[in-house]
């Protein structure tokens, strides 16, 4: 581990990193076998693997014959014992010392996931590989990154293990900062801002640091596109206060955390000239179009995860970015990494991820038309056996104690990089709007919202954010869509949007069910401005990190606190007449 850090710190050799990646992917099948063997040799003596009778064998066939495919629920009791302080080799040979929390935005509560040195090492490998391909197409010099990153506090589990979100565990690791420095993208903001206890204050200071180092900013990034859009929506509200801070060299009283105030006082000096420049730029912008390149003229690109539930934010992000390219970050989850973006010139909507064959052992459940993948759960195919154009659910085995673990993601094979597949993220397999025979995915919801939102364009209105819910307490059950708008719209327009939403779900099961009233009329509920910000605040209040926040696109019945926030902020309700 120490050697890895020293190697990164010494010099970042872009061509060598690319060469190593090419070698790994040329013989992906062999690398996969070696990776599985390594995982099983390290962990073969664990309670979990002993249970399935591997008896020291490390070949893929025996592994697949003996060890079952599982979901998080199956492993949860084992992980809980680790978190509670059981030091016996339960899932891994070496004790787990850190626990990651999943975002919790999908299911309503965070999951515990083991985190160890090997996962950190694969994170750095992903970062380095991605940067090498990115830097080849969009080279940057010595500068800084305006990174809207926020680290929630780590806490101790009942058994004394450090626990925090996956992003927190990465940001707090010494390797992270060294790697960023080696890749010429150190963060503009001091640690006190990144690790601040109040994300509103941290965000304000991230923006201020970006302005202080405006000429040095080469990359604007965050874990997710949502955080970048949220940051610049906030900038629209606070820019004049930021200008005053820069003009006077004194930090606004809105920042109250002593450690942040002290750190910022070392950076902030009176600069009337810069204050005038920023004021003039902001005053002449048309509806904030091209805000990012105007404020940070040496920025090469915007970087963050932009697929899946982040796609709805791309329109606003492009508005802020002007002509700057949007580069989608890599494919992973709290449980571990899957693939790296080696084609950074592709727009986010078309981005693919080449699977790294040495960071885990990968299997793929063929889906056909069955999004739940249950029927095929016993017949997954290997990394090199996937077929072009087919959709699969990802199953992986990693170095941190997850064995044949269903990630819950649906991917499509779009091509191959040497011997490894290039995957396109399709949707979360469990994010379905479904009442009976209808099946609508997150992508279907997104397309329906996009179609309906076009009716708002002429009025210069936009959908700020959205989510959905299946109301089965009514008979017949029906879909409920929640919208937050940027301004006021007429009843006539919103009724039209509601009907358009209903018609835009083109799944055959939905349409046929609507026609015979087996599914009731869709409801569009408009919520107050700031409602989705309240959802973000609620998530952070539960210990989540802003960097990991994803607006849940479907709120299930168990997520009662989110439903309560949404329901208590509804200002108008419209019922579809599309199938009357």
UniProtKB/Swiss-Prot annotation:
Its EC number is 6.3.2.52. It is an enzyme of class 6 (ligase). An L-alpha-amino acid binds at residues 167-171, 534-538. ATP binds at residues 100, 120, 123, 164, 169, 332-337. Jasmonate binds at residues 103, 329-332. It catalyses: a jasmonate + an L-alpha-amino acid + ATP = a jasmonyl-L-amino acid + AMP + diphosphate + H(+). Pfam families: GH3 (PF03321), GH3_C (PF23572), GH3_M (PF23571). Induction: Induced by wounding and oral secretion of the herbivore Manduca sexta caterpillars. GO terms for biological process: defense response. GO terms for cellular component: cytoplasm. It comes from the Eukaryota. Keywords: ATP-binding, Jasmonic acid signaling pathway, Ligase, Nucleotide-binding, Plant defense. PANTHER family: GH3 DOMAIN-CONTAINING PROTEIN, JASMONIC ACID-AMIDO SYNTHETASE JAR1-LIKE. This is Jasmonoyl--L-amino acid synthetase JAR6.
């Amino acid at each position: 581990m120490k050697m890895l850090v020293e190697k990164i710190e010494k010099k970042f050799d872009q061509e060598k990193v690319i060469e190593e990646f090419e070698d790994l992917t040329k013989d992906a099948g062999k690398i996969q076998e070696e990776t599985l063997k390594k995982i099983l040799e390290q962990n073969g003596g664990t309670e979990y693997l002993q249970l399935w009778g591997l008896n020291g064998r490390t070949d893929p066939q025996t592994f697949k014959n003996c060890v079952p495919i599982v979901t998080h629920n199956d492993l949860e009791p084992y992980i809980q014992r680790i978190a509670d302080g059981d030091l016996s080799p339960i899932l891994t040979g070496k004790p787990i010392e850190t626990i990651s929390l999943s975002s919790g935005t999908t299911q309503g509560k965070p999951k515990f996931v083991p985190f160890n040195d090997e996962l950190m090492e694969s994170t750095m490998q992903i970062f380095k590989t991605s940067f090498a391909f990115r830097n080849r197409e969009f080279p940057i010099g010595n500068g800084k990154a305006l990174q809207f990153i926020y680290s929630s506090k780590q806490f101790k589990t009942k058994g004394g293990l450090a626990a925090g979100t996956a992003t927190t565990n990465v940001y707090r690791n010494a390797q992270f900062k060294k790697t960023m420095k080696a890749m010429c993208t150190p963060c503009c903001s001091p640690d006190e801002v990144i690790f601040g206890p109040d994300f509103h204050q941290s965000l304000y200071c991230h923006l201020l640091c970006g302005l202080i180092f405006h000429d040095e900013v080469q990359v604007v990034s965050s874990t997710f596109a949502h955080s970048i859009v949220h940051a610049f929506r906030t900038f629209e509200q606070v820019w004049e206060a930021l200008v005053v801070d820069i003009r006077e060299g004194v930090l606004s009283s809105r920042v109250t955390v002593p450690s942040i105030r002290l750190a910022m006082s070392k950076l902030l000096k009176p600069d009337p000239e810069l204050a005038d420049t920023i004021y003039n730029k902001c005053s002449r912008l048309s509806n904030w179009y091209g805000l990012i390149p105007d404020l940070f003229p040496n920025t090469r690109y915007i970087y963050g995860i932009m697929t899946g539930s982040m796609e709805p934010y791309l329109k606003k992000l492009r508005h802020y970015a002007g002509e700057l390219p949007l580069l989608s970050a890599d494919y992973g989850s709290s449980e571990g990494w899957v693939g790296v973006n080696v084609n950074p010139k592709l727009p986010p909507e078309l981005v693919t991820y080449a699977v790294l064959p040495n960071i885990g052992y990968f299997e793929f459940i063929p889906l056909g038309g069955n999004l739940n993948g249950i029927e095929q759960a016993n017949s997954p195919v290997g990394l090199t056996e996937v077929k072009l154009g087919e959709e699969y659910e990802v199953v992986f085995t990693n170095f941190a104690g997850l064995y044949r673990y269903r990630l819950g993601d649906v991917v499509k094979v779009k091509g191959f990089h040497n011997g490894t597949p290039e995957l396109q993220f399709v949707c979360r397999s469990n994010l379905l709007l479904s009442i009976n025979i209808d099946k609508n995915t997150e992508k279907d919801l997104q397309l329906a919202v996009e179609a309906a939102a076009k009716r708002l364009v002429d009025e210069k209105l936009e959908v700020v954010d959205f989510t959905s819910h299946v109301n089965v307490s009514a008979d017949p059950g029906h879909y409920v869509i929640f919208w937050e708008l940027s301004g006021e719209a007429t009843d006539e327009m919103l009724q039209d949007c509601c009907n358009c939403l209903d018609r835009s779900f083109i799944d055959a099961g939905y349409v046929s069910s609507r026609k015979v009233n087996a599914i009731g009329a869709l409801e569009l509920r408009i919520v107050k401005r700031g409602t989705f910000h309240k959802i973000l605040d609620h998530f952070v209040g539960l210990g989540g990190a802003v960097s990991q926040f994803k607006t849940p696109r479907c709120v299930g019945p168990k997520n009662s606190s989110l439903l309560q926030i949404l329901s208590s902020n509804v200002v108008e309700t419209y019922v579809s007449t599309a199938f009357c």
